[in-house]
Regions:
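Structural preference for beta-rich elements and adjacent junctions enriched in aromatics
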Residues: 9-338
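Hydrophobic h-region of N-terminal signal peptides that target proteins for export
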Residues: 1-8
Length: 338
């Protein structure tokens, strides 16, 4: 039996000259249907925001194609709509890949929901409809290997669509997958990005100055979030595994009758005690249900490092990650367990 309790704290900081997007709650309107078409009346509650600037290759310059997005929310979900203009829709690069593959054209939305300039939750969707997600820590320090943790795999929903203007995407993100404070009216950090594959071009909503010290601390602001109710997250993933072994029976031996059966079970659970305190629980875990590790052969005396993907060990694992000198070191390597 393994139990983990994770807590969070929220910080306040002064408002800078960053961009501000103001969202609105869906009150009387029906929530958007996630079909990628952007036709639901709820989207009319708020305007699009745009004016993206290049991050690569020509920082600060106008991108080849502009991008728009808007955000609405209700008491359980936050909804994001993207409009990605493209003068040559047939040239949009759509590549299927595994989760977190980031192949072809894609867009990303990231929320610093604690407004602490240190951590953020990132959601990416490719033009082909492939999802990617990362938990960002350490202010998104690109020099640290573990600042962008793609082993974080929350539950959320998305759909994309292509038309004569380019391509669109809709995202539906449960508030239970995010961590935020208890203030009646909240300010979150906000960043949106687009990757235009044909030009290997990245553009951003909140422009970053050259050599800006950090990533999350340079986010814009998301305002208009009012009366967000604490989400009592409850996720239970039970499993049952059966095994049947057959062999040649032995006459007169009741213990060798030709077959043996085995039954095994357990569960993983994530329970939200409060909105910023989560209990992770695993009982008799079957770690064989997680993605298989890539094949590797060790020809020296050093242990091979494998990425952690087991749900129990993923939550807030950056606590045990430290940078010493020019390297990234783990005080605790969870893959030695199980």
């Amino acid at each position: 039996l393994l139990i983990s309790i994770t807590g969070y704290t929220q910080q306040n900081h002064s408002v800078n000259t960053s961009k501000v997007y103001t969202t609105r709650a869906i009150d009387t309107q029906e929530a958007p249907v996630i079909d990628g078409l952007l036709k639901d009346p709820a989207w009319d509650l708020v305007p699009f925001t745009s004016d993206f600037k290049q991050l690569q290759p020509d920082i600060g310059e106008e991108p080849t194609e502009q991008t728009q997005f808007k955000i609405v929310y209700d008491d359980k979900y936050i909804y994001v709509a993207f409009r990605c203009f493209d003068s040559d829709p047939d040239g949009i690069v759509k590549r299927l890949s595994r989760r977190d593959g980031f192949e072809g054209d894609w867009v990303e939305i990231a929320f610093d929901s604690y407004n602490d300039d240190r951590t953020a939750f990132s959601f990416t969707i490719t033009a082909a409809g492939v999802k990617g997600d990362e938990f960002i820590s350490n202010n998104g320090d690109f020099s640290e290997r573990n600042s962008f943790d793609d082993s974080w795999n929350p539950i959320w929903y998305t759909k994309t669509n292509s038309d004569d203007l380019g391509w669109t995407a809709e995202l539906k993100i449960p508030l239970s997958q995010l961590r935020f404070g208890k203030a009646e009216e909240q300010i979150w950090g906000l960043q949106a990005k687009r990757f235009y594959f044909r030009n290997t071009e990245r553009s951003m909503w909140q422009e970053l100055e050259p050599n800006f010290p950090g990533y999350v601390s340079g986010f814009g602001e998301l305002r208009g979030l009012k009366n967000l109710k604490p989400q009592k997250q409850l996720e239970i993933q039970p499993y049952v595994v059966t095994q049947l072994d057959t062999y040649e029976a032995q006459a007169g031996n009741p213990f060798r009758d030709g077959n043996d059966t085995k039954l095994n079970g357990g569960l993983d659970a994530k329970i939200g005690i409060t909105n910023d305190l989560t209990l992770d629980l695993t009982i008799n875990p079957d770690f064989g249900q997680v993605d298989a590790d890539p094949a590797a052969i060790a020809l020296d005396g050093f242990q091979i490092f494998f990425q952690e993907r087991r749900p129990f060990f993923v939550e807030n694992k950056n606590i045990f990650t430290y940078e010493i000198g020019n390297g990234n070191d783990n005080v605790f390597y969870s893959r030695r367990i199980g």
